[in-house]
Design a protein with these regions (language model features):
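Short hydrophobic beta-strand that contains or immediately precedes a catalytic carboxylate
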Residues: 81-84
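Beta-hairpin (beta-strand-turn-beta-strand) motif
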Residues: 86-87, 222
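Acidic, metal-ligating active-site segments
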Residues: 89-140
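Short, basic, low-complexity termini and linkers enriched in Ser/Thr/Gly/Pro
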Residues: 166-210
Length: 433
């Protein structure tokens, strides 16, 4: 139990520390703003340095002038927004059975069309040993692998929604009764339970097909899966391939996709300014700083974040310059390499990410920005579609209890003996202290 009286004694020290940090942040902000102005004057040379030299930190490449400020256009009256989010029940050896549950929230919101929305979730229980322990061959814990599989499921379901809502281009569309898995390389990546769920979802989603209107696919968080960098190549492929296949389907359906990051802590754009502050003629982190980039002389504004700087530069409804991320994992993304910009959505500065194919087509790019901004306005500071997808996906404490109660009933009906939780779990639930 938390002793608040003891915590209160530490509050004064915390408040004094935060006050000093706020003053220091203003100094860093002034330095960053000055470097931004200087870098704009030498932007072509700095971009060339970024492209030709190996740096010890991730610096995004600006593909527009650094002083770009663009007012985002109004969203069309008739449009559709789709979103997915996921949640799970973690596996535990202390429960009555070692299994886990993935729950993917699905949202389709139609505006100006007189159509009902889709708000539901698709649960899946993973219990077969070949699914539970497949990741152990790569030294990955089941609990960790479960999170990766949730990411895959979110992307696959988002692709299905985009195809069903907007239709697939290039003669690859499916009939109303057909399985959405065909021809996209997903079959080998899905468990048996996932196949049956996909077939059910195909029948449900067939009711959504109508004449197309501008449509946006939204996902919560980054499109850059940094965690993949540390995984063995076979595990990385098993996760990334179905995700990119789903993004291919969105591209063919001409449904732009964005990754929306609220309160982003990234400094990838600011790191480009470190090229300007580098005291050496040619940036070579290994040669001049022995690879120790955190304390390098070019790091003059840490720990300032991108959104802090752009909050001083953008007006509500404006976006900043477009950047191309330099994350190493993006070398595996092909035509889905990730770009991003910062958008003043009114309540905050959001980082909005796009696959390369969205940026390359102006209509898709403009649609993505205008519908994203509209979603934030409708959600009073956060995209309403993402908030609803989260609400559909979240597994609360009561849901967890009912899930295991249902599982216990089925195990007893199957004639299993000694069904129950471990003594440790039972003791934690029924404390008498």
């Amino acid at each position: 139990m938390l002793d608040l009286s003891k915590i209160a004694q530490q509050m004064q020290g915390i408040s004094q520390h935060l006050a000093k940090e706020a003053e220091a942040a203003q100094v860093r902000l002034a330095i960053a703003a000055q470097l931004l102005h200087q870098a704009r004057l030498q932007q072509p040379q700095l971009v060339e340095q970024l492209q030709t030299h190996q740096l010890g930190f991730a610096a995004a490449e600006p593909v527009e002038p650094l002083d770009t400020r663009v007012s985002i256009g109004a969203a069309p009256e008739a449009h559709t927004v789709i979103a997915t989010d996921g949640s799970q029940i973690n596996p535990s050896h202390h429960e009555i059975a070692y299994c886990y549950l993935l729950n993917i929230g699905r949202v389709v919101l139609h505006y100006g069309q007189g159509r009902f929305p889709l708000l539901d979730s698709q649960p899946e229980v993973i219990y077969r040993p070949e699914d539970l322990y497949a990741s152990r061959q790569w030294g990955i814990r089941t609990e960790e692998w479960m999170g990766y599989q949730r990411t895959v499921s979110e992307a696959v379901v988002l692709g299905e929604l985009g195809v069903e809502v907007n239709g697939e281009k290039g003669g690859r569309g499916k009939g109303k009764g057909e399985n959405l898995e065909g021809g996209h390389g997903l079959t080998g990546q899905l468990s048996k339970g996932q196949h049956s769920l996909r077939n059910k979802k195909s029948r449900q989603l067939s009711l959504l097909q109508r004449p197309t209107v501008p449509t946006l696919a939204m996902t919560d968080g980054s499109l850059i899966y940094w965690f993949l960098e540390q995984l063995p190549a076979p595990a990385r492929e098993q996760i990334l391939e179905p995700i990119l296949a789903s993004w291919d389907r969105l591209r063919e359906a001409q449904v732009p996709m964005v990754g929306y990051l609220s309160a982003s802590r990234s400094s990838e754009a600011l790191n480009f300014l470190r090229l300007q502050s580098c005291p050496h003629e040619q940036p070579d982190c290994q040669k001049h700083c022995e690879g120790q980039t955190d304390g390098a002389p070019c790091q003059v504004f840490s720990p300032l974040r991108d959104v802090t700087l752009w909050a001083t530069l953008l007006e509500p409804g404006q976006r900043g310059p477009l950047f191309k991320s330099s994350a190493d994992i993006l070398q595996l993304y092909g035509e889905h390499r990730v770009y991003f910009c910062h958008v003043h959505v009114g309540a905050e500065i959001a980082r909005v990410e796009f696959p390369e194919w969205v940026v390359q087509e102006q209509t898709l790019f403009d649609t993505a920005l205008s519908l994203t901004l509209m979603q934030v306005q409708k959600g009073f500071g956060y995209p309403v579609s993402l908030a609803e997808a989260h609400n559909q996906a979240v597994v609360r404490g009561g849901d967890r209890s009912r899930f295991f109660a249902l599982l216990e009933q089925q195990m007893i009906r199957a004639g299993l003996q000694n069904v129950g939780t471990s003594y440790k779990e039972a003791r934690k639930r029924d404390s008498i202290a």
